[in-house]
Amino acid sequence: MRTSQYLLSTLKETPADAEVISHQLMLRAGMIRKLASGLYTWLPTGVRVLKKVENIVREEMNNAGAIEVLMPVVQPSELWQESGRWEQYGPELLRIADRGDRPFVLGPTHEEVITDLIRNELNSYKQLPLNFYQIQTKFRDEVRPRFGVMRSREFLMKDAYSFHTSQESLQETYDAMYTAYSKIFSRMGLDFRAVQADTGSIGGSASHEFQVLAQSGEDDVIFSDSSDYAANIEFAEAVAPKEPRAAATQEMTLVDTPNAKTIAELVEQFDLPIEKTVKTLLVKAVEGSASPLIALLVRGDHELNEVKAEKLPQVASPLTFATEEEIRALVKAGPGSLGPVNLPIPVVIDRTVAVMSDFAAGANIDGKHYFGINWDRDVATPEVADIRNVVAGDPSPDGKGTLLIKRGIEVGHIFQLGTKYSQAMNAAVQGEDGRNQILTMGCYGIGVTRVVAAAIEQNFDDRGIIWPDAIAPFQVAILPMNMHKSYRVQELAEKLYAELRAHGIDVLMDDRKERPGVMFADMELIGIPHTIVLGDRNLDNDDIEYKYRRNGEKQLIKTGDIVEYLVKAIKG
């Protein structure tokens, strides 16, 4: 490609509304332009990256035995009502009507559509297992789209769905998808972790997320420093302390704390170690419980894990925190004065809280706390459960090493769905015994547009993007200095351009009448990995300047060797 025949829409200034580096650089590099909130037009440079990501995904899915299909973005509401998600999905599901006032949705996922297809196409266990995938536009009406294509409303996704007659068969395909995803992200040159995850709104049993490690990531990625254990923050188990509870050394005393309504204020005003404090959070109980609220206790320096808490059988789903009015009606004290002593509702405490002694907590009286509380002496030990987020330094749940925490961007997710959708939609085949058998399903997603942004978050410097070779919009930039005045430079540029393209290398030749500084800045901004500079001075010595974008190193290479050098650098 020649810049004279290309739309190179680079920007010098960073747009004010771009918060994260990928959004800033995608705008500045001329990859995307905003159309409306959460909606983006992809420009030629962006599309080239997108297609390379798609191609890698498609190749590895095909290699893993998946079959490509293409399903409609617009889906009839009847399918969503049949699966039960019409009511469950919430406002992210964009509901529309056609001219006949028939309700439809813009698909955020395609479980219903593929299940409907399969129940009408398959009739025997002999046709299974099968794994279908598509690369298709999705739409989720995010309440606050942000971070460019990282959290947009419309996005491109690879979603796959597998169908089985046994859990063993599902596990085989699940493992194959795990391997395929690992190959996909490795080929793209990304630093990623596959982590155990909660199944969330999709449902099902086993689940893994594929997280690209990046400082700007929205997720906490947990992994051991001594093993391959990895999980997301919602799933990671906080192991119970091995040390037994220490003996009581203090009497419980009631202390006036009128200005301490938070743990931080209590610690500061009374010089308490935060590890000796407990915070009490009240949430709604399941309908029909003797008490409308449940108390959840975690150590003062720990955070409640809402996913774990919601899974407690006595806690209502979705997890809902009690309002101050509801708390006062039941406990007669405000949220900043709650604690386990004389609390008239059921209590669940975290494993760490269970081994605490001589601790401080609210007295369930406004402006007062109890200091020196001890379990079984001052209050009976309640139910104990893992309800907190892990922290760095916690022991790894597999018993090997301690936990580290890094930020991550979720780019892929695989689920063992089981029979959630097939049961609801009666997707069955004739089994080996001649009876109807409900199908077991898996689903496997990759956010194609999100991968592009995540790759940038991991590969940039102060001059722009640093693409890995496999997904760069162009692999080589040819910068001919003063080519419009130097026939020698022009002739060599054209020769190298043709030779590199003949080797299947994506080349961008900058044939604009621009200053060298502008040409260099643009090529670095859009992140082309390999740049060759042709100038009369170096050509006098039969040399070409080569620059590698990732480390900025320059070297002179003989004109007769440059093509071979680049082919080897790119293709190995």
UniProtKB/Swiss-Prot annotation:
Its EC number is 6.1.1.15. GO terms for cellular component: cytosol. Coiled coil: none annotated. CDD domains: ProRS-INS, ProRS_anticodon_short, ProRS_core_prok. Keywords: Aminoacyl-tRNA synthetase, ATP-binding, Cytoplasm, Ligase, Nucleotide-binding, Protein biosynthesis. It is found in: Cytoplasm. It holds the Pfam family tRNA-synt_2b. One of its GO terms (molecular function) is proline-tRNA ligase activity. InterPro entries: aa-tRNA-synt_IIb, aa-tRNA-synth_II, aa-tRNA-synth_II/BPL/LPL, Anticodon-bd, Anticodon-bd_dom_sf, Pro-tRNA-ligase_IIa, Pro-tRNA-synth_IIa_bac-type, Pro-tRNA-Synthase_IIa_type1. It catalyses: tRNA(Pro) + L-proline + ATP = L-prolyl-tRNA(Pro) + AMP + diphosphate. The keyword Oxidoreductase does not apply. Disulfide bonds: none annotated. One of its GO terms (biological process) is prolyl-tRNA aminoacylation. Belongs to the class-II aminoacyl-tRNA synthetase family. ProS type 1 subfamily. Consists of three domains: the N-terminal catalytic domain, the editing domain and the C-terminal anticodon-binding domain. Catalyzes the attachment of proline to tRNA(Pro) in a two-step reaction: proline is first activated by ATP to form Pro-AMP and then transferred to the acceptor end of tRNA(Pro). As ProRS can inadvertently accommodate and process non-cognate amino acids such as alanine and cysteine, to avoid such errors it has two additional distinct editing activities against alanine. One activity is designated as 'pretransfer' editing and involves the tRNA(Pro)-independent hydrolysis of activated Ala-AMP. HAMAP family: Pro_tRNA_synth_type1. Homodimer. NCBIfam families: PRK09194.1 (NF006625), proS_fam_II (TIGR00409). This is Proline--tRNA ligase. It comes from Klebsiella pneumoniae (strain 342).
